[in-house]
From Swiss-Prot:
Gene3D superfamilies noted in UniProt: nicotinate phosphoribosyltransferase
Family, as annotated: Belongs to the NAPRTase family.
Protein name: Nicotinate phosphoribosyltransferase
Entry function: Catalyzes the synthesis of beta-nicotinate D-ribonucleotide from nicotinate and 5-phospho-D-ribose 1-phosphate at the expense of ATP.
Pathway info: Cofactor biosynthesis; NAD(+) biosynthesis; nicotinate D-ribonucleotide from nicotinate: step 1/1
HAMAP family (UniProt xref): NAPRTase
Domain of life of the native organism: Bacteria
Broadest EC class assigned to this enzyme: ligase
SUPFAM superfamilies hit by this protein: Nicotinate/Quinolinate PRTase C-terminal domain-like, Nicotinate/Quinolinate PRTase N-terminal domain-like
Modified residues (Phosphohistidine): H242
GO cellular component: cytosol
Organism: Brucella melitensis biotype 1 (strain ATCC 23456 / CCUG 17765 / NCTC 10094 / 16M)
UniProt KW keywords: Ligase, Phosphoprotein, Pyridine nucleotide biosynthesis
Reactions this protein catalyses: nicotinate + 5-phospho-alpha-D-ribose 1-diphosphate + ATP + H2O = nicotinate beta-D-ribonucleotide + ADP + phosphate + diphosphate
């Protein structure tokens, strides 16, 4: 792949619109895996996705021009999957499995378009919502976040000259490479790029992926970004997300249906995929409640992704649960992915080395760590905690509790109801930076 002069590319403002999203494959792989299941099982469910800025001190509507944001969102709505992309999805092997996507699903996907959006400004923030069929609104999550984060980066760098930009990117590259050198010291490390949604820019994410590919070789197992996986001949990686149990819980008509929602998701997932994709995401309504109510067959799955508890604490809890079910943790897999950086990767790796198989999904601190890189302090280059979550399903509010109360989303009354139902034990409040 041809190398891009990042500083010169940023400085050149001669185009009318520089599209941030140029392909519908510029998304996380698990969105396509989940989409196929949603298309097959829940085609008549409507779901609303909404932007949530957890770093409320950052006034996005003051930093990002509304006209530019609308232009980028409008451009994304013009995109369709290309013939080349459809051939790749149909013919490539994912997780050791050929034709993971059904021909009927791919035929439907070929004509898929991002639905309309609702955007307004309020108190220095943007209220951004996507209403419509779940099969369509789910595909907005990653592009919307990538657009807003990159527009914020562009606004922060708008007044920098070419030499300042050269210094900025030179320092960011050196900072990134110093992390690569530390990761090389961890034998048998398995790490992948999970950094699409809160990246500095698409081009910077591509640079980081190529740097990891060269810098740590086989320890770099792939990327969640489907377009980059295709373009760089890497594995496309990803399993499932919180939106699945959140929607099923919102649709529940009885207490039994609410309690069983996370496990029904797993049963559906196993029917569609199985094999290497049997990774449990346990924290939508708190990991403690998930483990307490889990059927015995959940212990037979390949592994867990503890996503919102401190990694060592969350990993230990799951290991103890496996042991209580008579399973050998050394044969199981833990995938750590919450706000990781090289320090937490090293600490977690050394803590669990030899006790369990490990994988690391490296996100925002891989693709958007520009702290201290600019010639002068620029707050707009600091990554923020921005998410796009499902907030409504068929008119019913959707809730995520998380193991960290700071990450809970949903109507406060519904959050309180879910806490009464699932319990509040072992949830630990932590500062959310990204």
């Amino acid at each position: 792949m041809a190398k891009t002069d990042l500083a010169r590319r940023v400085y050149n403002h001669t185009w009318k619109l520089d599209p941030i999203i140029r392909s519908l494959l510029d998304t996380d792989f698990y969105k396509l895996l989940m989409l196929q299941m949603i298309w097959g099982l829940y085609p008549r469910v409507d779901a609303t996705f909404s932007l949530i800025n957890r770093t409320s001190s950052v006034r996005l509507a003051d930093e990002i021009d509304e006209g530019e944001l609308r232009a980028q969102l409008d451009h994304a709505r013009t995109l369709r999957f290309s013939k080349k992309e459809m051939i790749w999805l149909a013919g490539n092997t994912f997780y050791g499995r050929k034709q993971i996507f059904q021909p009927e699903f791919l035929a439907w996907l070929h004509d898929c378009q991002l639905p309309e959006y609702e955007l307004r400004r309020k108190d220095g923030q943007y209220e951004l919502h996507f209403h419509g069929p779940w099969t369509h609104t789910t595909m907005w999550e990653i592009p919307a976040l990538a657009i807003i984060n990159e527009l914020r980066s562009r606004a922060a760098m708008k007044n920098l000259g070419p030499f300042s930009l050269d210094v900025l990117y030179a320092r960011a590259k050196a900072k990134m490479w110093s992390k690569v050198e530390r990761l090389r010291q961890l034998p048998d490390l398995k790490i992948s790029d999970f950094g699409t949604r809160r990246r500095h820019s698409f081009l910077w994410q591509r640079w980081c992926v190529e740097a990891l590919k060269e810098g740590i070789g086989s320890a770099f197992t792939g990327t969640s970004n489907v377009l980059l996986a295709m373009d760089t001949d890497l594995e496309a990686l990803g399993t499932n997300a919180h939106e699945l149990p959140m929607v099923l819980a919102a649709l529940a008509k009885t207490d039994d249906e609410l309690r069983s929602a996370p496990y029904r998701v797993l049963q559906d997932w196993n029917r569609y995929y199985g094999g290497n994709l049997l990774i449990v995401l346990p924290d939508a309504f708190g990991t403690a409640a998930f483990l307490r109510n889990a059927p015995d067959w959940v212990a037979d799955w390949t592994g867990f992704r503890p996503d919102s508890a401190p990694p060592i604490e969350g990993g230990e809890r799951i290991i103890e649960w496996w042991k209580s079910k008579g399973k050998d943790p050394r044969e199981k897999l833990l995938i750590f992915s919450d706000a990781l950086d090289v320090d937490t990767i090293e600490e977690t790796y050394r803590h669990f080395e030899g006790r369990v198989r490990m994988g690391f999904g490296w996100g925002t601190n891989l693709t958007n760590d520009f702290a201290g890189c600019a010639p002068q302090s620029i707050d707009g280059l600091k990554a923020i905690s921005l998410v796009c979550k499902v907030t409504d399903a068929n008119g019913h509010p959707a809730v995520k509790l998380s193991d960290n109360p700071q990450k809970a989303t949903g109507d406060p009354k519904e959050v309180a109801r879910y806490l009464r139902f699932f319990g509040n034990e072992e949830r630990v409040e932590q500062l959310v930076r990204v």
